[in-house]
Amino acid sequence: MKKIISLILAFTMLLGATFALSSCGLFGDDTPETEKIYVQTNAYFAPFEYYDGTKIVGVDVEIMEMVGEKLNKEIVWQDGDFGIIIDTVKEGKLADCGAAGLTITDERKEKVDFSDPYYTSIQYVILPADSDVATKTTDGVEYIVWEALAGKTIATQTDTTGWIYTDGEINATKDNDYGYAGVLYGTDTKHVEMDSANVAAETLGLTIDAVIVDELPAKYIVANSAKDFKCYPLYYSGEEGQADSPVEEQYAIAVTKGNTELLDAINEVLATLLVKGEDGKTEIEKMVMTHMGMND
């Protein structure tokens, strides 16, 4: 009896060992676990990334999912503060890349590699519908120049391009690293930092006079808010007879330096998405329209 029990136990242990080895791929199972690409974002920047229920969707999401398919890797989205995205990608430990409507800047290029640009945006100003901020019109385009915001309280999302521009125009003097005086320096203009442009917009007309944010998020907020807002492009006044000009920027995806496989794959995907179709529109432009709810 003891011998039979011993044989049963031995057989059971052999089966367990065989299962463990086959689970480790040592018995010809050559199907590897799907590798993952970790993407940092801040999902409050529609139409590029935003929540649809509990799921993150948007233009950047579609782009990166195509990259995942190309490399046969799973895309894992990490939603966090916008201000930590570049540094997190730089370290390369918790994230492989960042996709959050990121503007290419020289300072950021010192920390990360950028993909080819895939969208050109300009800064916009969101105002209450009854705002007294003056506008200008040139060639049929109604816009606001920085000087019109003098003495106002302006809100921006921390560490965004809007934040960078606003901080510089209010605080820059010729004696610091900027090398020039900000347009709003000395005008008693106040700058309030907030977690998102959406949160800032909720205070418009109360403690905030204007919100500065990128064009499409501005239009998305105005179109989807229960409150009555309006928005205009933000321009710099022309000097010495030159025309006024918009505050422009280009979006790209940030990648940890040295990760050429991922960077190349992103650029290859973007190259296909930036080809204009028979209708004269790129796939990126069509994605933008879809997520703005503007499809025909």
What kind of region is each of these model predictions?
Residues 20-23:
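C-terminal motif of bacterial Sec signal peptides marking the signal peptidase cleavage site
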Residues 34-59:
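Short glycine-rich His-centered loop
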Residues 42-43, 119-127, 215, 223-270, ...:
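Periplasmic-binding protein-like
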Residues 65, 69, 74-148, 234-246:
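Acidic, polar ligand-binding/catalytic clefts
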Residues 74, 140-144, 156-190, 264-296:
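Ligand-binding clefts/hinges and TM-proximal coupling segments of bilobed small-molecule sensing domains
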Residues 76-89, 141, 177-202:
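Short helix-initiation/N-cap motifs at beta->coil->alpha
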Residues 83-87, 101-111, 165-169, 173, ...:
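A ligand-binding cleft/hinge motif common to bilobed small-molecule-binding domains
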